[in-house]
Amino acid sequence: MNTPLTDLLGCRYPIIQTAMGWVADANLVAATSNAGGFGFLAGAVMTLEEIEQGIAAIKAKTDAPFGVNFHMYVPFAEDIVDLCVAQRVKAVS
């Protein structure tokens, strides 16, 4: 299915799995992305190290694109952005 959203995010279906705190972990994100949706890791409830581990776990389970959600007001927000860029995460919110 081609829509502006699927073209932008590189997913098969225009379905976004939101970054629900304490629920949207690497397993859910990878499963969503593998099913053709676009999964978001709930980084807003994680430390930088947990986000890094989550990204690695997602990449071990899927080659499909995914995103990371986080709060811009955390002291390490710039580090999260740098991590997402370095890991080629498709989207952040």
Regions found by a protein language model. Name each.
Residues 1-93:
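Active-site entrance/lid segments in N-terminal catalytic domains of soluble metabolic enzymes
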